[in-house]
From Swiss-Prot:
Main localization category: cytoplasm
Domain of life per record: Bacteria
Record-linked HAMAP family: FdeH (MF_00611)
Gene3D superfamilies: FdhE-like domain (3.90.1670.10)
GO biological process: protein maturation
Protein name: Protein FdhE homolog
Organism: Haemophilus ducreyi (strain 35000HP / ATCC 700724)
Job description of the protein: Necessary for formate dehydrogenase activity.
Family to which this protein belongs: Belongs to the FdhE family.
Gene (name only): fdhE
Length: 305
């Protein structure tokens, strides 16, 4: 799946196509506020409490940087690029020519995190702070091209959070009269990243499934009861530690032997992709013991995956 800008004469005639919105863009301020709050709520009585609270603090920093150091206006540049490259993923993580703004975000994130860091985390931050722009861009290239093993897990978290803050703001500036093209739906139609989880929505999109991007935070629609990794539907199963009413389940596929978590807003309206995925790590361990491979990506799990 990719997206294209609709010509003016197609916007009104195509209104019926948006009864099921194929693509939802994030509201970064609301997203980071909600995510940090959810992480702190889930930290209570969770064996990963310290890590969840650490993650919440980093999300707080993302929100602060969003408000105090925005990337600026890229809208005209993005519109021109989209017009010339119809049907392509506009912010393709492997091809989009990022500028130094993401590096400024990374260094600002490090600066705000250092006063609270100790031990190995402080060592990691100091290494990244002293690295050259060329070295940092090389590490980012590895992550964006899915060569995760080439980057230290401790470094990956901070680099990805800066990249995500950059990409999310870029996605926010894409023209809103865009339409998703039918095609491959396994990765984000905006940037090509893997999803964190899928979410079954409430409200205007009630009952619809959307996959939540791990990089630009956009969401794209995908049919339920269909594997988000291989499109097969004949051997899907749903797993949880609780009851059939659990708000978090793992959807496994017997055809490709992958799994992706599904969050149900009707069971818990406060579920949040990154936070709930991270807090339910024990479900990942259980799924891997059953022989399934995780198809989703969570930046806070680089050190575990």
């Amino acid at each position: 799946m990719s997206i294209r800008i609709l010509p003016e004469n197609e916007i009104k005639p195509s209104a019926s196509a948006f009864e099921i919105p194929p693509l939802l863009f994030a509201n970064p301020k609301n997203l980071y506020t909600r995510r940090a709050k959810r992480l702190r709520e889930l930290a209570k009585n969770n064996p990963l409490r310290d890590y969840l609270e650490f993650a919440a603090h980093l999300v707080d920093i993302q929100l602060t940087l969003l408000e105090t150091a925005p990337i600026g206006n890229y809208a005209e540049k993005l519109t021109a690029y989209l017009t010339e490259n119809q049907g392509q993923k506009p912010l393709n993580k492997q091809q989009f020519a990022r500028d130094e703004k993401w590096l400024e975000l990374l260094l600002a994130l490090i600066k705000q995190c250092k006063p609270y860091a100790t031990g190995a985390i402080l060592t990691t931050l100091e290494f990244l702070e002293k690295a050259s722009y060329a070295e940092l861009n090389n590490l980012a290239d590895h992550l964006l091209n899915e060569r995760y093993e080439q980057v230290s897990p401790d470094q990956s978290v901070f680099i990805w959070l800066a990249l995500s803050l950059y990409w999310t703001q870029l996605a926010q500036q894409l023209p809103r009269h865009t339409q998703a093209e039918i095609g491959e739906r396994h990765t984000c139609p905006v940037c090509g990243s893997a999803p964190i989880t899928s979410v079954i929505h409430l409200d205007k999109t009630q009952g619809l499934r959307y996959l939540h991007c791990a990089l630009c935070e956009s969401e794209w629609n995908m049919t339920r009861a269909q594997c988000s990794n291989c499109d097969e539907s004949g051997d899907l199963n749903y797993w949880s530690f609780d009851t059939v009413e659990a708000p978090i389940k793992a959807e496994s596929c017997g055809d490709c032997h992958s799994y992706l978590k599904v969050l149900y807003q009707e069971k818990d309206p406060y579920v949040e992709p990154l936070a709930d995925d991270l807090a339910s790590l024990m479900l990942d361990i259980e799924m891997e013991q059953k022989g399934f491979v995780r198809s989703g990506l969570n930046p806070f799990l680089f050190s575990i995956e």
